[in-house]
Amino acid sequence: MKNRLLNICILCMVFPFFLQAADTHSVYNLRCEQEENPLGIETGQPCFSWQIQAQQRNFEQSAWQILVADSPEKLQAGNGNIWDSGKTLSSASILVPFKGKELKAGQTYYWKVRSWDKEDSPSRWSCIHTFGMGLLSEKDWSNAKWIALEKDRKDEIVTIGLHGLANVDRELKGKKIGMYRLPQFRKEFTVQKPVKRATAYVSGLGHFDMFLNGEKVGNNFLDPGWTKYDKCALYVTFDLSGQLKQGGNAIGVMLGNGFFNIPRERYFKLLASYGAPRLLMKIQIEYADGSTQDIVTGTDWKTTESPVTYSSIYGGEDYDATKEQTGWMQPGFDDRTWNKALDTGWKTRLLSQRSAPLTVRDRIPTVRLFKTRKGQWVYDLGQNFSGIIRLSLHSKDTHPVKLYPAELLNPDSTVNQSASGAPFWFGYTPKGKGIESWQPQFTYYGFRYVQVEGAVPAGQPNPDGLPEITEITGLHTCYSAEDVGSFHCSKPLFNQTYELIYLSLIH
């Protein structure tokens, strides 16, 4: 009996390996338009790619079959109602074009693939993957409007991009442009049924941060990408399915200027203003019962001035924490003092942002703290990088703090911004209620050093009772495309050369 039981146990352990051995190969790492489960696809003929894992060497694919369906249930049942390629004799596995029915705007599609080896043995079907279509025409936006806090000042519209002080002075004389207030928007809505999928299509110009029920949507930085805005603007697609809740929900959006509106203040490499910062959004909710609901931007949205009091892609960013309104991103907030959003009437061509977003890649701690001959405190982060800072401080009042980033130092150890453009600074006005933390949202700079004005490092003499800084950390922001390879060898010089090239590419 014991021997029989032992044999059964051995068979149970070994049997899966026999099953695995029967599979000559498998399909994995599926990609659509070179992304895993992408959103915002606009081409009517997306391309599919996959990789093959085989047990034998010199494997060669002899054929493939792709199924595409408009529901996972159909695909699971083997029904490719959008495309069934049939067994296609081909060794191709990279950028295989879709050749099925017309793809619809805003629709999510499901696909899988299998392949045959040169002995005509098929693999098992791959796991199911998805791709989501973007909004393909103006009508797909369901009458969403570009909304703003302020009207455009028509006599200040500059879309050609003025380079250099001489050109700016000649064209604008003493006129300041781009001095619009930075807005934040909110909209509440109700979800009353189980949600199958929810997708947001968002363009906030120059840049936006979006929040749902108080939580930031995505980890993107400086969305959307830069364009010639009177020719086209990019929108970004987000899957909100896991963030919506039954009952009341609230959307909040903050805008920065970016290249859409460059104020004629501080440093500017070029000057342009397409008008007041503005927002366009459509949220498409698909319910489990097959019904749908659209939430779109319009004059029923509420808006007010945000705590971001200055935003320039070239000159920096200021934030006044005393202007924060607790709970404004949450449902139930009292927004009766807010304004109705303005319909700008503006139009431009809209394209889906298909590149990987900028994100925070690394946190870079302070490695050295020193005082200049003039008495300013300087934080040395140990390496040059592009990005922003993370500031934490303790304050008993609202004394403003300025942080000057720079790549270089002057002979007297003060920061030198000549290599990157001056003047540039991050400004923060605390609430004055203890520990506070902040990081800029709509600008970036290349720097290693941070010089402080209006605060002192914690633990240092502070006879004037200034805010005390407990942390300055660098946040390295860069392109977030995944690494697909690396290099390392026994020669330190080659490794260092590779590292320099790598850092240059991702900055």
Which ranges hold each PLM region?
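Extracellular/oxidizing-compartment recognition motifs
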Residues: 23-108, 112-506
